[in-house]
Curated annotation (Swiss-Prot):
Name of the protein: Polyprenol dehydrogenase
Binding site for NAD(+): 55, 208, 212, 245
Catalytic activity: a di-trans,poly-cis-polyprenol + NAD(+) = a di-trans,poly-cis-polyprenal + NADH + H(+); a di-trans,poly-cis-polyprenol + NADP(+) = a di-trans,poly-cis-polyprenal + NADPH + H(+); a di-trans,poly-cis-dolichol + NADP(+) = a di-trans,poly-cis-dolichal + NADPH + H(+); a di-trans,poly-cis-dolichol + NAD(+) = a di-trans,poly-cis-dolichal + NADH + H(+)
Recorded name of the encoding gene: Dhrsx
UniProt pathway: Protein modification; protein glycosylation
Cellular compartments annotated: Lipid droplet; Secreted
Amino acid sequence: MSTLRALRAVLCVYAVGIAVALAQLLRRLRGDFRPPVLPPQPGRVAIVTGATAGIGRSTARQLARLGMCVVVAGNDEHRGQEVVSSIRAEMGSDRAHFLPLDLASLASVRGFARDFQALGLPLHLLVNNAGVMLEPRAETEDGFERHLGVNFLGHFLLTLLLLPALRASGAEGRGSRVVTVGSATHYVGTVDMADLHGRHAYSPYAAYAQSKLALALFALQLQRILDARGDPVTSNMADPGVVDTELYRHAGWVLRTAKRFLGWLVFKSPEEGAWTLVYAAAAPELEGVGGRYLRDEAEAEPLGTARDQELQRRLWAEGLRLTGAGGGDSDGVAW
């Protein structure tokens, strides 16, 4: 990637981050930072990826407080078991489980789906939260650029593998939900179908933005497919905003310095960042409502490109090809 294009990617991502952070500051100064009030969710079962830390951990805990049974999915068993233990201690219940999941490995994704099936639980909610951000170029076990592989392709396959359980658990007036975590960086992203893996030109900023736009395209295309099939499942995007998490460890020194000194003021805490995810997961007004982009517990408008149905179809087909889910017989996925 040329120096000019790489610099443009950095500046665009920073500009979006600054705009979101300032909006959060204004909201905080207005006293508008309040958690959503949601009804109890007894009997519901949720899977949260990346629930061993940050937004995912806070999301899992908040869902458990609503009465859901939560499956903590992550690649750090020690931290995962700590989250499960804390939920069980707080709730006085054993309705929390840890299952290993490495989204950088399609074999691990398939193994997770089998492990979940072995639990014998229904599935009412899938929160696609885990992700990587601004990492130097590296590839997953399957040869995918890591942002694309972890953020998009891993969740793509996971969702397809779990859709039969989501369908079976949903009912008219009480459907299942898929909540995919988005980012405002998708507004400055492009999906390069000719070089998805950044082998010819790479910028961690462009790669992250591309992965988030890919997730938006995926979430909206998924809703179109669910609608066509008449499935009792909805698919929405939830943008947590700029949140103080470990993801910034690969960011440039400017962003890390700003986070260190101003994070307490302009960044959301993981607990606050989880509010939009939990709202998408449990708000009664979203029953049967899909294809939405949610931010600050309200509907927002995604980038117009995210609604490009031709690009949605092309990316979906490429996702099927890359993950091997196209035929579906071996994994129980049929389209």
